[in-house]
Design a protein with these regions (language model features):
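Short, low-complexity, intrinsically disordered N-terminal peptides in bacterial proteins
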Residues: 1-5
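A polyanion-binding, active-site-adjacent surface
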Residues: 6-8, 15-163, 167-177, 182-185, ...
């Protein structure tokens, strides 16, 4: 059985990592990689978790499945490697960031600095076949990422959750906790829905206000 090291997340997810469905999921993804192209690269499958350990989580931005075109998916929701053309949803996120906080538009789409500052950028499905959106959506990833969200109930620190679009908002029942929580819902930032309420939703300032109200430092949302 393949051993997955999730660092500090491992104790929170041990039951999932040992479950038969998870072994079958990894086997299926491995077979898909052997037969064709799967994104993100294998070493980046769990990057969202390893980049933002549980004790550092201050905000969670939930995505769907990874980008399915070459060179884009890097293991963080909405993020692309520096130098890659910005996908439309990310471009809209940056527009809202500028409107909300007055920050300059970033030069690139790598959101790793956010992850390192405590923003968990989690897709609900962690792999995808090349050119085939949602191709791995029914493989078992959602059971695993639901467990990640449910495990965060045990985190004692204040955490803000950002749920963009109806798919993300279905996860709201998993986010109950005795610790301080903020759940922000808005339409998805894709061009199809961004003008229905994503623009003007001001998530970044709301997250920082919530954190400061609960005695925490605000997130530094600046990007290169």
């Amino acid at each position: 059985m393949q051993v997955i090291d999730l660092g500090a997340w491992t104790p929170y997810l041990e039951q999932e990592l040992r479950a038969p469905y998870f072994a079958a999921l990894l086997q299926r993804v491995g077979a898909a990689r052997a037969a064709g192209t799967v994104y993100p690269p294998e070493e980046r499958t769990f990057f969202a978790l390893t980049a933002t350990p549980p004790e550092r989580v201050r905000a969670v931005i939930l995505g769907q499945d990874p980008y399915h075109e070459p060179g884009q998916a890097m293991g963080l929701a909405f993020s692309v490697p520096q130098g890659e053309r910005l996908p439309p949803s990310l471009r809209n996120i940056f527009t809202e960031l500028h409107t909300d906080l007055g920050l300059p538009q970033p030069f690139g789409g790598d959101l790793t600095p956010w992850a390192e500052r405590g923003v968990l950028l989690l897709n609900t499905v962690l792999t995808v076949g090349r050119g085939a959106a949602n191709s791995h959506a029914a493989w078992g990833w959602q059971r695993f990422t639901d467990a990640v969200l449910a495990a965060m109930a045990a985190l004692p620190q204040p955490v803000a959750f950002v749920l963009w679009g109806s798919q993300a908002q279905k996860k709201r029942p998993l986010l109950q906790s005795a610790a301080p929580r903020l759940v922000l819902c808005a339409p998805h930032p894709s061009p199809l829905s961004s003008y229905r309420g994503f623009f003007g939703s001001r998530p970044f300032s709301q997250i920082n206000a919530f954190l400061q109200e609960n005695g925490e430092q605000p997130v530094d949302w600046r990007l290169p």
